[in-house]
From Swiss-Prot:
Protein's UniProt name: Tripartite terminase subunit 2
GO CC entries: host cell nucleus
A Pfam family per the record: Herpes_UL33
The keyword tRNA processing belongs to this UniProt entry's keyword annotation: no
Domain of life assignment: Viruses
Keyword annotations of the record: Host nucleus, Viral genome packaging, Viral release from host cell
InterPro entries attached to this UniProt entry: Herpes_TT2 (IPR005208)
Gene that specifies this protein: TRM2
Localization of this protein: Host nucleus
Keyword Repressor: no
């Protein structure tokens, strides 16, 4: 796959077309970009759950981690939303 930065905008399939930093095996579980983003979101949620379950009380660090996860979810949501609009305009 050609690097995202070296291709013209017209040649890119979508705004979320990027060179994968994941191992090739992950494509079996998550073949599309959207499923990879969902997998990332799920893994972050699982990590938080495991940390909170292990600790006896809620701490400031847990709240900071939760806020970071919320921020990542918002970014993922905006990427998908922008890509959807971009593809809609591209088709029309």
């Amino acid at each position: 796959m050609t690097s995202f930065h070296t291709r013209r905008v017209e040649d890119r399939d979508s705004l979320i077309d990027f060179q994968s930093m994941l191992p090739p095996d992950i494509k079996i579980i998550a073949p599309t970009t959207y499923t990879r983003l969902n997998l990332l979101n799920y893994c972050q949620f699982l990590e938080l759950f495991m940390q909170l379950r292990a600790s006896g009380c809620r701490c400031e660090h847990g709240e900071i981690l939760e806020s970071k996860i919320r921020a990542v979810r918002q970014v993922i949501s905006k990427i998908v939303e922008t890509d959807t609009v971009f593809n809609g305009v591209k088709k029309n």
